């Protein structure tokens, strides 16, 4: 192992030294008189400045232009640009490397000292340093053909806000409205003056006014004046209106007059659109507080009841306007949505707005095709294909009916351990209704920007494990999905029924399948809650939480008083499963800079079978290993506990457990542009049984479960094409829980030069999407 590591380290060092040597010679490609701009250094000389490091960082980041990017000290993109040379044609490899991979040199002539002095002055004043002294110089080295900039800054004292005044003396109703929310100001006494805070406070005021009828107001009509007349480091801030620049409409509060929904809008160029949208042969159908305009009744008027958030007579509200648009979008029935607001006055001079929502229906019917292929390390390949048909408005209320036919196979083309080929075919139907069916039974919050939905699902799947068993499953579900807010989602399925029928073949004795066989009915509710802070916008730290509660047979068990010592109770002639299952998936994402990310996940899950069941149905149990689990172990062949197939003469098809604990950490960093990322990861965890199984010794969960933790690590690539993420991971075991005490950690046995070691330990995972 040491020899292979030394060779690998030596080759890596040699390649890096060669790249650095080449990078240092980039200036030889410059024309006579040209220099390469290497960047600028900013030094804040005020020793008393508490924010010295912060100032140097933000000021250095403000200087323009930016020098050529460096990766571990090497201007890699500039080197590739120079290596490629001048393209001889508009196509070809040379052109691609130069334009797509490479980066043109940033020349010294593009660096303007005086312009950057002004940039730094503005940046300092925007952060409360109103009277700085900036000394700059430029260093041109004609011999090395390089240019550098140097800025020495005496920031001076920083000014803090003493008093904040909101339009005192202004007697207009608009000014009074602004003063009403002065207590919610983002500008606080004693805080340093920050232009960003002033701009944010203007936006806060604008948002409030737009939600109280002031349709024509703009934050640009507000100006913050600063008085630095005192000899102290305190200033007074006066928020004022630019009254002389504001049109009369700005001071008026508008109310809603009428609301119209046009479901036949044609989105074209301006000229064509006007002609296409003339309201010929259209009916205007009044319904409650709005009217629907359409040629024929493609959509029932009641559809828009939960979407339209304002009523005639209400003060105009930007928030409710956006909420209406978002709810119309979430109906998933329209490909184009546009709102128009027209101002008018009533006979008394009251300012009014007429709202028109123009909707272009999406094609009502659509076909979809999906295909996928995969390869696994245990010499297995597979493929899946599905064909779907969707109707987006099956009952004229934006109800969506989707029917999907799918099929696939998985087979072995080699390898020491032979497993049977698998075949699957299935039919699924899904009806989605944009409202809560029987909604009066549930008290849920549906005031978010997303229309709550009800789902009715019906499906059948047939699985054939060649020479071992065949499996038939029928499922029916009735449930609800709604969003409490943009980052909180609930899924409640009070009715979930799955019927499972498994038949084994006579020659199935080659494999032990009792641990994956279940015959009977799974009946009970499920509830899932998801929180995702990433949806709300970019933050340095984001959180994700997904919790699931899955119950089966509990009400039936209470009614029938089930007892494990007796034969299982039946319903419709079939035994039913009785269990409680809970699982949580918690993730933390920490960003460094603009693109680097540290992703972490903790998964905890447990299922307990009781009453009418001795063990959990296999389709509800947990497994470990694979592309989204412990990536250094093969999928479904890790655990339970310290058990391993090498310790048993039994031939297992897969290994499952009742408890799962797993922790993952992964650091992602761009390798090229934004679409190619590299990753280094470590995974740890395992699965366990709650009840002893003599065929899997060591598989039961005990107080010493830590001894059974498996650990793997590796490297990966992520090809992020926005709409698709292709992931390649190479993992290997670092700790094998089935090994003898003192030998479980296998890091010191790593031997990349050994073919047999690589075949046994390197696991290649090809997958779609990030693992977490």
For the regions a protein language model found, what residue spans apply to each?
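Gram-negative/organellar outer-membrane beta-barrel architecture
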Residues: 297-298, 317-546, 631-632, 638, ...
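Bacterial N-terminal signal peptides that target proteins for export
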Residues: 2-11
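Interaction-mediating elements
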Residues: 2, 25-330, 339, 446
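C-terminal motif of bacterial Sec signal peptides marking the signal peptidase cleavage site
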Residues: 20-23
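One-face residue pattern on beta-strands with alternating periodicity enriched for small/polar residues
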Residues: 384-390, 426-430, 457, 477, ...
């Amino acid at each position: 192992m040491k020899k292979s590591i030394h060779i690998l380290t030596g080759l890596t060092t040699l390649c890096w030294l060669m790249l650095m040597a080449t990078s240092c010679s980039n200036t030889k490609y410059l024309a006579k008189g040209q220099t390469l701009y290497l960047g600028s250094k900013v030094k804040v000389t005020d020793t008393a400045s508490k924010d010295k490091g912060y100032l140097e960082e933000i000021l250095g980041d403000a200087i323009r232009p930016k020098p050529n990017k460096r990766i571990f000290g090497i201007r890699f993109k500039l080197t590739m640009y120079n290596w490629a040379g001048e393209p001889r044609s508009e196509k070809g490899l040379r052109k691609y490397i130069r334009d797509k991979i490479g980066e043109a040199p940033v020349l010294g002539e593009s660096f303007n000292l005086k312009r950057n002095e002004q940039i730094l002055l503005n940046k300092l004043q925007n952060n409360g340093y109103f009277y700085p002294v900036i000394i700059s110089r430029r260093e041109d080295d004609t011999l090395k053909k390089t240019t550098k900039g140097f800025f020495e800054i005496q920031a001076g004292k920083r000014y803090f806000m003493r008093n904040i005044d909101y339009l005192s003396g202004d007697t207009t109703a608009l000014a009074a409205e602004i003063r009403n929310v002065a207590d919610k100001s983002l500008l606080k006494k004693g805080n340093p003056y920050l232009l960003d805070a002033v701009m944010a406070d203007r936006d806060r005021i604008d948002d409030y006014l737009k939600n109280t009828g002031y349709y024509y107001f703009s934050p640009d009509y507000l100006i913050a004046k600063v008085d630095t007349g005192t000899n102290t480091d305190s200033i007074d801030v006066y928020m004022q209106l630019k009254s002389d620049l504001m049109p009369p409409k700005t001071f008026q509060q508008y109310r809603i007059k009428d609301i119209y929904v046009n479901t036949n809008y044609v989105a074209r160029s301006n000229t064509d659109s006007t002609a296409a949208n003339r309201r010929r042969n259209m009916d205007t159908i009044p319904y409650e507080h709005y009217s629907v305009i359409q040629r024929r009744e493609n959509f029932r008027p009641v559809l828009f009841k939960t979407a339209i958030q304002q009523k005639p007579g209400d003060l105009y509200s930007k928030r409710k306007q956006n909420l209406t648009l978002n709810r119309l979008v979430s109906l998933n029935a329209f490909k184009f949505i546009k709102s128009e607001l027209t101002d008018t006055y009533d006979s008394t001079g009251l300012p009014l707005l007429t709202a028109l929502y123009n909707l272009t229906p999406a094609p009502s019917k659509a076909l979809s095709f999906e295909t996928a292929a995969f390869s696994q390390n245990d010499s297995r390949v597979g493929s899946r294909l599905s064909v779907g048909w969707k109707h987006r408005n099956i009952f004229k209320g934006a109800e969506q009916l989707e029917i999907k036919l799918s099929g696939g196979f998985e087979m072995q083309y080699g390898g020491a351990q032979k497993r049977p080929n698998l075949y699957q075919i299935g039919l699924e139907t899904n009806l989605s209704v944009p409202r809560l069916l029987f909604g009066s039974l549930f008290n849920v919050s549906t005031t978010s920007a997303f229309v709550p939905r009800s789902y009715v699902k019906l499906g059948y799947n047939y699985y054939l494990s060649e020479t071992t068993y065949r499996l038939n499953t029928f499922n029916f579900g009735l449930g609800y999905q709604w969003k409490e807010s943009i980052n909180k989602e609930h899924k409640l399925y009070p009715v979930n029924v799955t019927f499972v029928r498994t038949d084994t073949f006579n020659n199935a004795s080659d494999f032990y399948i009792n641990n994956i066989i279940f015959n009977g009915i799974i009946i009970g509710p499920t509830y899932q809650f998801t929180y995702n802070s990433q949806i709300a916008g970019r933050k340095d730290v984001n959180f994700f939480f997904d919790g699931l509660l899955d119950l089966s047979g509990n009400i039936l068990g209470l009614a029938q008083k089930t007892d494990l010592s007796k034969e299982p109770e039946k319903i419709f002639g079939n035994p039913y499963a009785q269990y409680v299952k809970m699982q949580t998936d918690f993730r933390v994402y920490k960003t460094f800079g603009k693109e680097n990310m540290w992703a972490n996940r903790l998964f905890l899950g447990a299922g307990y079978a009781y009453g009418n069941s001795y063990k959990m149905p296999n389709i509800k149990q947990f497994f470990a290993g694979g592309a989204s689990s412990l990536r250094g172990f093969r999928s479904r062949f890790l655990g339970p506990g310290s058990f391993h197939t090498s310790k048993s003469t039994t031939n297992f098809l897969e290994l499952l457990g009742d408890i799962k604990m797993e922790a993952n950490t992964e650091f992602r960093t761009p390798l090229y542009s934004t679409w190619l990322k590299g990753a280094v990861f470590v995974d740890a965890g395992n699965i366990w049984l709650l009840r002893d199984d003599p065929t899997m010794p060591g598989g039961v969960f005990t107080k010493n479960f830590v001894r059974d933790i498996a650990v793997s690590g590796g490297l990966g690539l992520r090809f992020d094409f926005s709409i698709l993420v292709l992931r390649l991971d190479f993992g290997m075991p670092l700790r094998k829980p089935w090994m003898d005490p003192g030998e479980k950690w296998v890091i010191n046995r790593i031997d990349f030069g050994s073919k047999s070691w690589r075949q046994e330990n390197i696991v290649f995972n090809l997958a779609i999407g990030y693992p977490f």
